[in-house]
Amino acid sequence: VESVYSLHGSVSPLKAICALCKKYSAHLIVDEAHALGVFGNIGEGYVASLGLQNDVSATVYAFGKALGIHGAAVGGKAILKDYLINFSRPFIYTTA
């Protein structure tokens, strides 16, 4: 789900979505492309501004919107990091 919808600038009902994910044991991936640099004490995004970091399975930060640079990052728990390191083909074969 997107945390902030670019067309209208409206925010997602993340607290309600997180509650549903808990109820049904679902994982939630949040796209923070339009919230990064805007929400939170230091611009860390809408998820952090609501204090939902532990309720979200993965947070995707695209740097091309607010930061105006190339690249992106995925935030999540250690198990997600280990999975991405070991199974993301473009990452596996990099040497940098």
Across the structure, where does each feature detected by a protein language model lie?
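Active-site C-terminal subdomain of aminotransferase-like
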Residues: Y24-H27, H34, F39-A96
